[in-house]
Regions:
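Conserved NAD+-utilizing ADP-ribose enzyme module
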Residues: 1-124
Length: 124
């Protein structure tokens, strides 16, 4: 990915980045998070714990700063993500934070993300 594409996608509104995320992770069958002795998590202004995820390593590592400065991009298989990790997040009360750009992200219920990923998978 060239710098122009990277910056263009990164500067889109959260809802557009969410659509990009769904298409890219289904196409690559890979989801990216930040990892260092455990996955990176954060909290929103209401104290809800969020699990940040990205469509590509470059976007994840762009956010590896401040509390996450020693974290590295780590990939997850899309099917394990859908079948194992997302249900675990739901049980634990975490919400996915999709495509954080150091400013905002799309925060959705787990069930909505699963629905959207499965709908996109049906196109393949």
């Amino acid at each position: 990915m060239n710098l122009k594409e990277f910056e263009s996608v990164l500067n889109q509104p959260a809802n557009i980045r969410y659509e990009y995320f769904v298409k890219k992770v289904v196409d690559s069958e890979t989801v990216w998070g930040l990892y260092e002795d455990g996955w990176a998590v954060t909290k929103d202004d209401n104290g809800n714990v969020l699990f940040p995820i990205w469509p590509k390593r470059e976007f994840a590592e762009h956010c590896a700063n401040n509390d996450w400065e020693n974290y590295l991009g780590e990939s997850m298989d899309l099917y394990e993500f859908i079948d194992d990790l997302l249900p675990r997040l739901k049980v634990d009360g975490l919400k996915p934070s999709i495509f954080f750009n150091n400013d905002d992200s799309a925060v959705l219920d787990v069930d909505i993300l699963i629905r959207d990923l499965k709908a996109e998978l049906e196109k393949y």
